[in-house]
Amino acid sequence: MGGGPRTFPGGLSKWQHKRMHEKLARHKERGLLRHEKQLYLARLRSEIRASRLPAAGASPPDDGDGPTSSRAHIRALADRFLLPGAEDLWNEDDGPIHRADRPRPPRRIVSVGGNGGDRRKLDSTKQELPRGGKEPRLAAFNPRRDFQTAAPWWWQWSSSSAIPSRTKEASFCFFGPKRSYSVMPLFQAHQESSGTSMVPLIARGLASARIAPSQLNGERFYSFAAGRFGRKLRPDSSDEDDEDISTAKKDMRFARFGASSEEESGYDELEARSAIRKKWSSAALRNCDMKKERRALKSYEEENNDLAGSFRELREEIKNREVLGAERRRYESRGESLFTNKRFEECGISPLTVKALTDAGYVQTTVVQETALPMCLEGKDVLVKAKTGTGKSAAFLLPAIESVLNAMKSHTNHRVSPIFSLILCPTRELAIQLTAEANVLLKYHQGIGVQSLIGGTRFKLDQRRLESDPCQILVATPGRLLDHIENKSSFSVRLMGLKLLVLDEADHLLDLGFRTDIEKIVDSLPRQRQTLLFSATIPKEVRRVSQLVLKRDHVFVDTVGLGAVETPTKVEQLYLVMPHELHFHMVYRLLREHIDQEVDYKVIVFCTTAMVTEFMYIMLRDLKLNVREIHSRKPQLYRTRISEEFRDSSRLILVTSDVSTRGVNYPGVTLVIQVGVPSDREHYIHRLGRTGREGKSGKGILLLAPWEEYFLNEIHDLPVQKSQTPNIDEEMKRKVDGSIKIVDMSIKEAAYHAWLGYYNSIGDVGRDKTMLVDLANRFCKSIGLEKPPALYRKTALKMGLKDVPGIRIRK
């Protein structure tokens, strides 16, 4: 048999071969189910049509409620694409158009004339009227005739000033290109006994002629005055021959496109017939191909109620803003104090939780806690905006614990242990931090557990941990939580008992990157729940999208205030503008200067991408600085270890990407350096918020290239000042260049590709591809590459850089 592993055709392994056949079996099963569904629908349609057929020997129903014909079915399908108010030129009695190359129809000779011998033959194809003062008898005309006309055409009486009468000789003229038509006659013959005959009355003749409405039984006509097309169904009558022209014009209408108020009474039968057609066409299609009905307009009372409710909500929001503004001014007058005079014992929370807070050193509430806790504990949906480092985590962890305690008091028996509180956060580091803080608050609570679900760990281990150690509070990232919901049915059952949903850093979770996952998660949660949203920045778009998870009567708590600065007031904000080739030299210069000034320094350096972060870390490490790195390319165990080390240490530098931007609490950070333009204003605020926490002082420096100065317009309302450019001596420049050279070539190429992708995604830079490639080539030289690395063809196509000069394509 051989000693190697067994393979199947195509080089597949045993498991690949098995999965392939399982996939083919599922595909075949879906096809059989689809075919069976089609047969069922066809049989159902046949039964519906058969049930509407008249019984054998019975007369067809007189209400026209029988099965639809093929012509009516096609007509109903075409009506679906007719826009409201458009004119329909469909004429069901029109036949096929005869082209010029077809033989002309034979002439029809009919007899016209009076009662005596004054009768002669009339050629119907020439459309002439006999001479002699007599009108033609139309009884001999066939119900269908073919003739040629000119288009455009109209009839012209021989004497335009005279009124045509029954004794007056009339003629009509044609001019224009010929067209062939096959139409039904406009008028049928009248009974000879009535002594009345008709001539076609159109254009000017209609204005003064008298007609008998009995001549118009079930036929089509055109009215210049009304401008409508339609079908008029009237009973035969000969008593109205002497009506005036207004009655005649009123009766001569086409009703295909509706009628005025005086016309509506005569079209009941036509509307009934149209309704029958639509009804049977939809039945044949089993309601699968119907137009969507327009939303009905609200009544006057409903509009007034909605308007009154909107005004009531607006008054409440204005009142809340005034209260919050007064409180904010009171705290500002006390000197920007973070804590208030209110103690946690006065907030109505569990004494065991208060005891745990006291042991941790927290006795008084902060501004956001004092404002948001009463509303959260009342069970309302709340959207909270507060500055970074003001105690938002405790403001939603305390209501989460209280919701679990209230749910456990009900003593309801559950088959599985339910999850009462769910906390979602965007990053793994933030989830780990919130889990640790929740464990501190649950120190004296017995029987309440908290766990975290984050990426970077084994899925089976998470399942085993959730089953062996059930929890009531779950902290998770959206991606890993969605994996458990979709792959583990028992986990979805546990979420059915949810009482509280919390979205920390809600603006980021409701952004385009996470919105799809959040929508799927919310769909799997019970609707009867409380939802809390917390963030330091809440743009207008997030306020609008927040309706996906919040109730309509939710409360918006803004502790920042309108027109207030969103960044910590004790943090000094500076920016530097330098050529991109000197950015790495300037970072080293700023770090050396800060280390000399601060004894217990603690610095965070934010880079644009993960690979640029790794490049910066290797360069600074070679320059003998005490530096660590965290970015998305590192395994989760490494990231957790470095995060804990940086949190508990001082005299340390952390080089990181945006994974450390939001929510992570690193106490005692003295300096934040942002290298390159942030992706948006919110990222700048959250990065800067890593320093100046809990009311302490700090410093932030933004390092930009000359072509990145556009970003200053987005933060013009923040107290950012331009700093004096420090000098870089030759010795320092030589040392940095030497450290750049020792970085591995693969890391440099990866940094170039990542830099190009990042700035290509920023609209202000990525619009001009030629300029973007030129800037990328400058960055390439700044990291020690002589020529830009080649891109894969697929990557260049995705980025829109395939034919841009300066881009090298890998062959």
Curated annotation (Swiss-Prot):
Q: Identify the CDD domains for this entry.
A: SF2_C_DEAD
Tell me where in this chain the Helicase C-terminal domain is found.
Answer: 570-740
Record: residues binding ATP: A386, K387, T388, G389, T390, G391, K392, S393
Q: Which Pfam families is this protein grouped with?
A: DEAD, Helicase_C
Which residue ranges are recorded for the region named Disordered? 1-32, 93-138
- Give the EC class as a word: hydrolase
Motif Q motif: which ranges? 342-370
What spans are recorded as compositionally biased (Basic and acidic residues)?
A: 95-104, 117-138
Listed under catalytic activity are: ATP + H2O = ADP + phosphate + H(+)
A Gene Ontology molecular function term of the record: ATP binding
Give residue ranges for domain Helicase ATP-binding.
373-556
Q: What are the EC numbers?
A: 3.6.4.13
Coiled-coil stretches are 286-333
* Domain-related comment: The Q motif is unique to and characteristic of the DEAD box family of RNA helicases and controls ATP binding and hydrolysis.
**What protein does this entry describe?**
DEAD-box ATP-dependent RNA helicase 48
Q: What is the lineage of its organism?
A: Eukaryota, Viridiplantae, Streptophyta, Embryophyta, Tracheophyta
